[in-house]
């Protein structure tokens, strides 16, 4: 059970985000080995980039169980009734021996209030484990994949004011702060993405995959209207990591232009396939991405355990 990123045409596409599961500076060798083993066995990372970025800033901690299971959970005040967010993974060679059940039990016992957990891929075993402990599904996140049109079919787009899209690499001082401000406004009601901090952004920017040329910025004069943040790790595939449009500019085609520009950037890098994450109930975003040829690949489910079932 783990956490992932999401995607929204008006609000954004995200994995902080995210779903990358790359080993940040906060990941020690033991955890990095477990992440690699789980990813090889499952086809997807066990932890989201957002969780690992929070681990780097001290907002999350690692909990181990017998060296075969690890959880990355938020650090909370034991005296408060705050919601604990966690995701955990069991070593592929140690599964079906009760380690997942034991880890979930520990997380439930330790949680001062409610507990939120993600299940990647909606595995039947995770469904049964969640149901047996009284966890209920509260969110669904779709993982979409699509082909990147060839460079001949896409040109770099300009936004409504006629100015070309910039990148983080060639933008003015303060562009990161502007991006974070738009991100917070675009994802104001988003449980993870909207709270992205500068420290967490810096942790993600320190990852080997980060390229400031892959962060596309749409300016309206001196105001940032939206951005498209891409993630390319190699292998011929790229991710629409975050697509965010300021609420004042939503509904005006900015999201579409940013996705078009993202496709053009990926094509220029020789990328032939793209993926992203989107909330299952985000109808506008789903319509937009399906128009670009994206189709559902898998689904993640978030479960919630309520410390007070009556509320």
Residue ranges and their predicted role:
Residues 192-200, 206-230:
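Phosphate-binding active sites in nucleotide-utilizing proteins
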Residues 1-17, 77-85, 91-164, 302-303:
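Acyl-donor-binding surface of acyltransferase catalytic domains
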Residues 90, 243-245, 278:
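Hydrophobic adenine-recognition pocket in adenosine-nucleotide-binding enzymes
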Residues 96-109, 245, 251-268, 287-291:
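Conserved acetyl-CoA-binding loop-helix of GNAT-fold acetyltransferases
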């Amino acid at each position: 059970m783990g956490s992932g990123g999401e995607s929204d045409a008006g609000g954004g596409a995200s994995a902080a985000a995210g779903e990358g599961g790359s080993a940040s500076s906060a990941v020690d060798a033991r955890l990095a080995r477990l992440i690699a083993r789980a990813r090889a066995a499952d086809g997807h990372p066990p932890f989201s980039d957002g969780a690992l970025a929070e681990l780097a800033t001290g907002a999350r901690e690692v909990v181990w169980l017998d060296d075969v299971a690890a959880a990355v959970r938020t650090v909370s005040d034991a005296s408060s009734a705050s919601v604990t967010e966690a995701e955990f993974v069991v070593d592929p060679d140690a599964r079906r021996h009760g380690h997942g059940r034991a880890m979930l039990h520990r997380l439930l016992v330790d949680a001062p209030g409610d507990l939120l957990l993600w299940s990647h891929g909606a595995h039947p075993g995770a469904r049964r484990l969640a149901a047996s402990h009284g966890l209920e599904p509260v969110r669904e996140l779709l993982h979409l994949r699509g082909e990147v049109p060839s460079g001949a079919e896409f040109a770099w787009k300009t936004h409504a004011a006629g100015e070309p899209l910039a990148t983080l690499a060639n933008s003015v001082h303060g562009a990161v702060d502007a991006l974070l401000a738009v991100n917070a406004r675009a994802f104001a009601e988003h449980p993870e993405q909207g709270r992205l901090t500068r420290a967490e952004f810096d942790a993600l920017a320190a990852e080997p995959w980060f390229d400031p040329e892959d962060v596309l910025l749409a300016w309206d004069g001196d105001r940032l209207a939206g951005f498209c943040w891409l993630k390319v790790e190699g292998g011929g595939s790229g991710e629409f990591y975050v697509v965010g449009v300021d609420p004042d500019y939503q509904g005006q085609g900015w999201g579409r232009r940013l996705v078009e520009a993202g496709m053009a950037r990926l094509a220029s890098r020789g990328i032939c396939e793209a993926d992203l994450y989107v909330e299952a109930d985000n109808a506008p975003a789903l319509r937009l991405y399906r128009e670009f040829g994206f189709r559902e690949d898998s689904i993640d489910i978030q479960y919630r355990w309520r410390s007070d079932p009556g509320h």
